[in-house]
Amino acid sequence: MGDSSGSRPTWPRRSAACSRNKVGKDCMPDDYSYINTRVRVMRTKLLDGRALDAALASGSYQEFLRVLSETDFAPNMRETTAEGAGLPELDRALSQNLFDTTQRVLGFADGDAKREIETLLMKWDLTNLKTLARGIVSGRGAETIQQNLIPGGTIKPSVLQTASQSTDLASAATALGVGGHPLAKVFRNAVTAYNTTGRLLDLEVLLDQGYYRYATQVSRDTSLRRYLSREIDITNALIARNSRGGTLDTNLFVPGGSLDAAGYGRLGAGDAGGNADITAILEAPSIEDAEVAARTALDRAARSSAVSDVEGVGIILDFLRRKEIEVAKLRLIGRGKYYDLPTDEIRREVQA
């Protein structure tokens, strides 16, 4: 995979204004053109169907590791083959690869483009904050919480690690406040709401509201705003699906999408307003099926954005989703091979 000629490609040059972090509206397309050229090269190094099939066809866990060591994951795989190594070493290797990838993409950008890419990466921060809150409330312990965190966000790993060792949400909020991350105050306010109602849903929706409020303020790229609007609609549909059978609480509405508060209220009665993606979520037979429908809709939206917005953030958005999916699939395959599960069973999990 990739160029083996050893020659250094000639990249499009960024304008002087963009290089000086003075990225204005006029030079944004040139800046994304540069970043997208780099990301297109990175996209060619994602594992294709044949590589994933080879990993699935591995006869053992050790053979699976050998297959991965012949890909661009090789630099991260050294610990996995050490004596006594197991799934924790594989998890660290895959996590480090995802983190390295996101940091490389971020390193291509500056100015407004960098802030918009950071906004995309902050979606993983949002997920991690929810994982952190659930873990602390349920008493899962720092190690378990850390195993379920997604690397690649914008919160420093050391800050997340410290927060995961907290025994209560207030202490976690204090730990997250170090460094002044945009979502730290959002988390603190969400914890206050949880302490009042005792409902994790209130905390999680306040995190959603805070993230999307920040993201829509930062976003200047048209395709990014369009994608965020779609993501907000999907989020509201999932909230409505989780509340099926009861009256929707308007305090749980996440603004910023195509739905207004009244449209959100109608979701409780199954009225999706003709939106096929929302319909699929509302009519899903289970919460798990609804989440699959949501991921499918967002994957489709990201692919569409990459095709329609070749001079904006669409290609980056699509690449980051593909990379996350790649790592998630390899994690599933690795666990299946480690526990010697039947290949067909692993394949079903990967395809789901």
Swiss-Prot record:
Signal peptide as annotated in the record: none
GO cellular component: proton-transporting V-type ATPase, V0 domain
One record GO biological process: proton motive force-driven plasma membrane ATP synthesis
Molecular function (Gene Ontology), one example: proton-transporting ATP synthase activity, rotational mechanism
Gene3D superfamilies listed in its UniProt record: ATP synthase (C/AC39) subunit, domain 3, V-type ATP synthase subunit C domain
Keywords carried by this UniProt record: ATP synthesis, Hydrogen ion transport, Ion transport, Transport
Source taxon at top rank: Bacteria
InterPro entries membership: ATPase_csu/dsu_sf, ATPase_V0-cplx_csu, ATPase_V0-cplx_csu/dsu, V-ATPase_V0D/AC39_subunit, V-type_ATPase_csu/dsu, V-type_ATPase_csu/dsu_dom_3
Pfam families (UniProt xref): vATP-synt_AC39
Alphabetical list of PANTHER family matching this protein: V-TYPE ATP SYNTHASE SUBUNIT C
Family stated for the protein in its record: Belongs to the V-ATPase V0D/AC39 subunit family.
Function as written in the Swiss-Prot or TrEMBL entry: Produces ATP from ADP in the presence of a proton gradient across the membrane.
Protein name, per record: V-type ATP synthase subunit C
Organism: Deinococcus radiodurans (strain ATCC 13939 / DSM 20539 / JCM 16871 / CCUG 27074 / LMG 4051 / NBRC 15346 / NCIMB 9279 / VKM B-1422 / R1)
